[in-house]
Amino acid sequence: MKAWTEVDIPGQRGRTAVVTGANSGIGFETARALALRGATVVLACRDLAKAEAAAIRIHRVAPQATLDVVPLDLASLASVRAAAGEIRARHDRIDLLVNNAGVTGLSGRTEDGFEIQFGVNHLGHFALTGLVLDLLLTAPGSRVVTVSSIGHQFGRIDTDDPDAGAGAYARSKLANLLFTYELQRRLQTAGASTTALAAHPGGAATEVFRYSSPWFRVPNLLIARLFGRTPAMGALPTLRAATDPEAAGGDYYGPGGLFEIRGYPERVRAAARAHDRDLGRRLWQVSQRLTAVTYPV
């Protein structure tokens, strides 16, 4: 089987993509690759200066790219609402939403009182997706791609207290998959052409570990470098989920090599609990209550 690479990304001219956390790492590489194929790319980032610097870097390799920068702090529901409002004011459709931004190793709470990894990685993206979903529904064949992690298999979620206990990062990444599968079921039931997919980068050397303790950060970066997982390689599963004409709603992409740490993107299988429909439904209900965001599907 031929390895899927950036060369396989179809033309994206006329399409609008929103990428969260697009200023660095996998998010930057995702935005760059989409811009090179002609997409209008919205870089939705917490640090506006870094986002603008990323846009300059993309313009160096894609001078004709149409780029937009929107401030987005996923640790603040007020910021999420403001970002959604800015996106809606500037764009009348979204063909692709990539929920990429993430944190790990941070302690503390979001502005709204949620455990920060669960709040940023899951609840912030849940809110953003709901607030712009009608723009996706307007675009035939649009996609929502949410970036999870191989670490989701260690996650456990108690929907009575979803952000409590140890293993916050794994829990948030499990939530990403539960959200994806529940969103896909709802879209399918509604007869929408919009689809929900997920991806994970394998072991890629990115800034997601920058807040982690050394005992966690250093081994992860060593593994990434040992197996040659640059951010550009780490972005390939996301890009395949986002653009491959053969990708279908509910598909999950990751590296096809040993332990899904390295290799080119292929369809992979999430842990059984990520497919728990009852858990997905209950997490959805809790997420709606915590964010005060309801969905049109």
Which residue stretches match the model-derived regions?
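Short linear elements at protein peripheries
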Residues: G151-Q153, Y252, A274, W284-Q285
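C-terminal amphipathic/interface module of NAD(P)-dependent oxidoreductases
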Residues: A271-V297
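Pocket-edge positions in alpha/beta enzyme catalytic cores
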Residues: L43, L72, L226, A272-H275
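Short glycine/proline- and charge-enriched loop/turn segments
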Residues: T159-A164, P214-L222, R262-A271
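Rossmann-fold NAD(P)H-dependent dehydrogenase/reductase core
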Residues: M1-S212, R289-V297
